[in-house]
Amino acid sequence: MQKLEIKGGRKISGTIVISGSKNATLPILASTILTNKKIIITNAPILRDVETMVGLLSTMGSTIKLNKKEKKIEIFNHKTLKTFAPYHLLKTMRAGVLVLGPLLAKYGMAKVSLPGGCAIGPRPINFHLDALKKMGANIKIKNGYIVASAKKGLKGCFIKFPKISRCYRKYINSILLCKRKNQIKKLCFRA
């Protein structure tokens, strides 16, 4: 591991502004589906994936104000949202699957396009789908879409990952509204 060592006789002080994280902003945006209250996200990095997620939520019925200069996103879900996330909006990003859990938790159904391309390479979503199935969701893959329902709602359960995972946000989104205690094992919270 590399380090930067500064030697000198003077004390260094000051402040820096840390930019927001795309990988934190995307699940936060998806989780706004769960509330009808106005949500304001500040210090949001306005990158292509964030703009795509904003476009998806807008298409689903969210009222959204995006201020690129202030890096601020205001979201208000004052009406019932559509539970359909089309391919043409999700073909360029993987994070579209993040809306699946909140849609199931709030509306009991969802039809979400399978994730689009990723520069890192293929990253399966089977852990996410298996966890939702364990929580009571009925999930089928039809014509490139995840078709899911949870007519009795999502139920808490014990989830053991087959390996350590950094994709905990997906699961946290899904389990927040479950009616009983949840347990997840082998979950890594390192950045």
Where are these regions (language model features)?
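Structural preference for solvent-exposed beta-strand-turn elements
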Residues: 1-191
